[in-house]
């Protein structure tokens, strides 16, 4: 059984009810988590780790924003109203993170998408990001992220510019 996109206190209540009633345990949490949206690190990820619940993040590539240089637009980015609500509030700091992601991609010989996914996979409790691909070659590219191990200093370089974001994605 899995849960998705809720506040940590809500999930803690659900976990408690599950235990009280002897119901099947929660084994996964689908949450909004990526290099430019890390609010889940404050409460949800520690709760999941403590409870042994695997995290399967949605939007691991920030709706494509982590796959290309920051100012580069696509038809999807221009027309994606959900993406604008999720990410446009924090453009300046996110641009710094994306720039550093690009440097790490060059340094490792990997793509930006592979580095972003490798970062996620380096986090305790993250089992597998929920990826989306519209072409077979995209899927093949993304799957290679499991073989990429980032150095601690590379992770720190990408994480340092992060600033707190408004919580989005659920009510």
Which positions does each model-derived feature cover?
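Substrate/cofactor-recognition hotspot
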Residues: 168
């Amino acid at each position: 059984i899995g849960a998705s996109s809720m506040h940590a206190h809500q999930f803690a209540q659900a976990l408690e009810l599950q235990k009280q009633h002897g119901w099947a345990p929660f084994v996964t949490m689908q949450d909004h988590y990526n290099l430019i949206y890390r609010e889940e690190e404050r409460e949800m990820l520690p709760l999941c780790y403590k409870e042994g619940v695997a995290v399967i993040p949605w939007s691991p590539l920030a709706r494509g924003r982590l796959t290309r240089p920051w100012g580069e637009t696509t038809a999807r980015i221009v027309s994606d109203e959900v993406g604008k609500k999720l990410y446009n509030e924090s453009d300046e700091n996110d641009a710094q993170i994306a720039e550093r992601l690009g440097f790490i991609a060059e340094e490792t010989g990997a793509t930006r998408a592979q580095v972003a996914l490798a970062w996620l996979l380096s986090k305790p409790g993250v089992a597998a990001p929920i990826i989306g691909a519209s072409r077979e070659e995209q899927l093949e590219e993304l799957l290679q992220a499991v073989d990429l191990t980032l150095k601690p200093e590379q992770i720190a370089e990408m994480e340092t510019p992060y600033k707190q974001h408004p919580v989005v994605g659920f009510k």
